Regions:
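Outer-membrane beta-barrel biogenesis signature
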Residues: 171-183, 194-195
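Surface-exposed loop/turn segments flanking beta-strands in extracellular/periplasmic regions
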Residues: 106, 201-212
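Outer-membrane beta-barrel "beta-signal"
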Residues: 165, 169-171, 208, 213-230
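C-terminal beta-signal and adjacent terminal beta-strands/loops
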Residues: 188-202
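Extended hydrophobic secondary-structure segments that form protein cores and membrane-embedded regions
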Residues: 1-3, 36, 180-189
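Short proline/glycine-enriched turn/loop segments at secondary-structure junctions
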Residues: 80, 153-155, 173-175, 212-217
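Detector for outer-membrane/organellar transmembrane beta-barrel domains
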Residues: 1-4, 9-152, 156-164, 169
Length: 230
C-alpha cells in the first residue's frame, strides 16, 4: 500500500507505472549537453508535470506524460561560463479523482479543481563570472508557466519567476562552474495564479465566478549558503 494525502491507497488504486527515456549526450573540452525525451505512464505520471518527486497518484493511473528536457553548460573562457535547463511537459488522461489544487472564487473561498490535462514549461539560465582567484559572481534566472485544463471546463494558469545574485568565495575558481563555495546571495521570487471563468456551475442559486484571481505572491530573501559540489 501507499499513503497519499493522509489516505491509504492500495496497489489496485495506483495501477502500474512506467517510465521510458531516450537520451542524447554531446560533450567536449568546454561544453556538455544532454537532451532527453521521456514518456511516463500510470500512477507516477501526474507528478512529472508539476516538478515533484516520485509520488504516486491514484487518479493518474491511466495518465500519460510526455516531456522533452535539455540541460548543459558552456565555458567560453577561464572567466565566463553558463549553465542552462529547458523543459516542456504535457500530461493527459487523468480521471476526476486526480486533484491538483485550488483557487479563490469570487466569494474568496477555496474551490478545488480536477485536472483533465496540463502543460508545463520551465527554463533556468545560470551565468558565472570569475572575479579573482578565489571569488566569483553567479546569477540564476528561472521561470515556469503551467496551464491546467479542468474537468469543470476552466483553465488555470500559474506563473513563477526566481532571480538570484550570489557572491561566492571558493578555494580555487579554476573550476569555474562548480566546486565548494561560501555564497552570499539575494533572491527575489514572484508567483501568481489565475483562473479564467472559474466556477460556472450553479451553487445555491449563484452562477459564474468569472475571471477569479488568486493573489500574487512575492518575496525577497538574503542569506549565506555553503556548497560542497564538484
Amino acid at each position: 500500500v501507499t499513503r497519499q494525502s493522509g489516505a491509504v491507497k492500495s496497489k489496485d488504486d495506483l495501477g502500474n507505472n512506467n517510465r521510458f527515456n531516450l537520451e542524447l549526450h554531446v560533450g567536449g573540452s568546454n561544453f556538455w549537453n544532454n537532451t532527453s525525451f521521456e514518456w511516463f505512464h500510470g500512477s507516477n505520471a501526474g507528478v512529472e508535470t508539476s516538478g515533484g518527486w516520485a509520488d504516486a497518484y491514484a487518479g493518474a493511473k491511466s495518465a500519460n506524460v510526455y516531456r522533452i528536457h535539455n540541460m548543459g553548460h558552456y565555458i567560453f573562457n577561464s572567466y565566463f561560463g553558463v549553465e542552462h535547463l529547458i523543459s516542456y511537459a504535457y500530461g493527459t488522461g487523468y480521471d476526476k479523482e486526480y486533484k491538483s489544487g485550488s483557487v479563490y472564487d469570487a466569494g474568496k473561498d477555496y474551490v478545488e479543481y480536477s485536472v483533465e490535462k496540463e502543460k508545463l514549461f520551465k527554463a533556468v539560465v545560470r551565468p558565472t563570472v570569475k572575479l579573482t582567484k578565489m571569488t566569483k559572481l553567479v546569477a540564476e534566472l528561472g521561470a515556469y508557466k503551467q496551464i491546467v485544463d479542468t474537468f469543470e471546463g476552466d483553465k488555470i494558469t500559474e506563473n513563477g519567476q526566481k532571480y538570484t545574485l550570489a557572491y561566492c568565495i571558493t578555494p580555487d575558481t579554476g573550476n569555474l562552474l562548480w566546486g565548494p563555495a561560501i555564497k552570499f546571495f539575494v533572491t527575489y521570487i514572484h508567483a501568481d495564479k489565475h483562473s479564467d471563468d472559474y466556477g460556472r456551475q450553479v451553487v445555491g442559486g449563484i452562477t459564474s465566478y468569472d475571471n477569479a484571481y488568486q493573489d500574487v505572491n512575492h518575496n525577497t530573501m538574503f542569506g549565506v549558503q555553503a556548497e560542497g559540489s564538484w
